[in-house]
Amino acid sequence: MTSAADQQPPPIRTDVLIVGAGPVGLFAAFEAGVIGLSCQIVDGLDKVGGQCIELYPDKPIYDIPAIASCTARELVERLLAQCKPFDPPIHLEQRVESVEQNDDGRWTVRTDRGLVFDVAAILLAAGNGAFVPQKLALAEAVPLESRHVHYSVPRLADFADKVVVVAGGGDSALDWALALRKVARRVTLVHRRSGFSAADSSVASMRRAVEAGEMDFIVGAIAGLNVEGDALKSITLRHIEGETQLAAEHLVALYGLVADLGPIAQWGLSIHAGRVDVDTSNYESSRPGIFAVGDIANYPNKQKLILSGFHEASLALRRAYSYAYPDKKRVHVHSSYDAKLAEKVSATG
């Protein structure tokens, strides 16, 4: 008889597992390919780009070398194009749960959705850790999640001809409210105050849409959800005048993301203030073979800059090479003279 364990697919074998698909993780995938390392990327979010895409996709970034200005979204698109010659597999909505070092020095890495990796080194490029949505503090919201209560908008079409309430005051809340007004029967934006933490252009667009009667805006806090059967019917709003009921079929709560190291905190790494201590000569953690780069790395005078993360990833991967190929000497070649790299770039350009 074949057991369930026998039916499991074999572990995915690669040189380096990159944890985090933000800008630093994407550049690390490119750099890994340049020096001859295979890699795969995992990220707990449902899209590539990490904190940049989740928190400020359309805000300008001015401190990337040779790029005078670009949005976070544009930067991520350029980084994806840059690593395209090596086509690194990216596994989204996969949170790394456990790591175990094997007798041969390699690592077995498992995710919360059942993926298993066999890798020579692990590169943590997880920013401030896994980002999870800040959820409503209402017990009645839990059974409605994914059906009537949402913390993201995977597909606009799901809200076609629906009565939708969007809660929040940041870029995500305003941007999604504006997008949803084009497909929903009615959209109401709810925020606890009249001021916003969103881009001025988004606030202006929202106010124009309200004035044009394309959507509504109400100042108030969500105090309760009213359900009939298993469906959301209305929302209780608390404001200065008291409480009122607002009809709703769907609630999209966009209160931002909460950073959480999650299982990484249990990996036996030296950690201070939620960040992983590293050796700045190679950005290796207290456990040989596990590296930390970008915002998750901790060392004296650390600067939380994207360009710093690029540098850290470059050095970390050169050390990781020695774990993947301990008997092979890596020969440094400037990219200008790297014929194989030029061929790959040409083939995908």
From Swiss-Prot:
Q: Which organism is it from?
A: Paraburkholderia phytofirmans (strain DSM 17436 / LMG 22146 / PsJN) (Burkholderia phytofirmans)
User: What is the name listed in the Swiss-Prot or TrEMBL entry for this protein?
Assistant: Ferredoxin--NADP reductase
Q: Which cofactor does it need?
A: FAD
- GO terms for molecular function, please? ferredoxin-NADP+ reductase activity; flavin adenine dinucleotide binding; NADP binding
Classification from the root reads:
Bacteria, Pseudomonadati, Pseudomonadota, Betaproteobacteria, Burkholderiales
What does the UniProt keyword field contain? Answer: FAD, Flavoprotein, NADP, Oxidoreductase
Q: What is its EC number?
A: 1.18.1.2
Report the enzyme's class at the first EC level: oxidoreductase
Family membership: Belongs to the ferredoxin--NADP reductase type 2 family.
